[in-house]
Amino acid sequence: MSLRPMMRNDNASRMLGMVVEHDAPGESRVSMTVRDDMLNGFAITHGGLVFTLADTAFAIACNEDERVTVAGGADITFLKSTTAGQTLTATAARRARSGRTGLYDIRVTDETGDLVAEVRGRSITTDRRPPAPVAEPVEAPGPRALHDPAPERDEALTTTEVYR
């Protein structure tokens, strides 16, 4: 399995414990075990994290060559809730690719094979080259409790600080 350079640098997916199980041009399979800190206020997996898993599988599938491909849009339909201890798997497959645009379907299933969510992703290929992989992956910070206060600052964050 060859991990694309973008995945070697993907601290967010690493922090969430995602595992790339399959990586081929136009397709991928990524899994993630749901932890307690991934649950929302109803004690079910936060929908944003289900989407993040699907988005990671989508990103791997659509980055097929030496040009950076990004999401141009995506729609998700949630079909089943899950909870801590369950393993979710996102399987992405290219449906069409024409010029710089692509269309991908991503299915998220639980460990029994039940469908949890479906995503339709639209990709746009740029002229940019992927960044060089970092020599050593950055250790992603662990989750911060929602009730922990943010660090005090005398001034608001600038846009540059937000996007660092």
What are these model-derived regions, one by one?
Residues 1-138, 142-164:
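Terminal targeting signals and extreme-terminal segments of soluble enzymes
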